[in-house]
Amino acid sequence: MIVPFEHVLILAGILFALGLVCVLVWRMNLIMLLIGIEVMLNAAMLAFVGGAARWGMADGQVFSLVIMALTSAEVSLALAMVVYLHRRKRTVDADEFSELKG
């Protein structure tokens, strides 16, 4: 059974909206900010894969692989920064990044 393309887009829109709410509501907590960005990127990836399946083109699937590589690099760098901030300041508040130097 194939899922209709409209359902895929609705699910991707709901996921993107949830990620956006997470980013907007918890923008001071860096962990929640990262989770929200990841959910939004996964929603975009779902829309690309759904579109690729709908029109029979591999471009959306290739672009989803690019998004996966981008998100893995983004998460590894951001989590390293969060761990550094937590060790130095004992908090994961986004405002504390402005006080770090070096």
Swiss-Prot record:
On whether Transmembrane helix is a keyword of this UniProt record, the answer is yes
The record lists the membrane-crossing segments as: 5-25, 30-50, 65-85
List the membrane topology term(s). Answer: Multi-pass membrane protein
What is the protein's known function? NDH-1 shuttles electrons from NADH, via FMN and iron-sulfur (Fe-S) centers, to quinones in the respiratory chain. The immediate electron acceptor for the enzyme in this species is believed to be ubiquinone. Couples the redox reaction to proton translocation (for every two electrons transferred, four hydrogen ions are translocated across the cytoplasmic membrane), and thus conserves the redox energy in a proton gradient.
Q: Name one GO cellular component term.
A: plasma membrane
Top-rank taxon: Bacteria
Q: Name one GO molecular function term.
A: quinone binding
One Gene Ontology term of the biological-process aspect is: ATP synthesis coupled electron transport
Q: What is this protein called?
A: NADH-quinone oxidoreductase subunit K 1
Catalytically driven reaction(s): a quinone + NADH + 5 H(+)(in) = a quinol + NAD(+) + 4 H(+)(out)
Question: Source taxonomy lineage?
Answer: Bacteria, Pseudomonadati, Thermodesulfobacteriota, Desulfuromonadia, Geobacterales
Q: Please tell me the species this chain comes from.
A: Geobacter metallireducens (strain ATCC 53774 / DSM 7210 / GS-15)
Q: How does it assemble?
A: NDH-1 is composed of 14 different subunits. Subunits NuoA, H, J, K, L, M, N constitute the membrane sector of the complex.
Q: Name one matching Pfam family.
A: Oxidored_q2
Record-listed E.C. numbers: 7.1.1.-
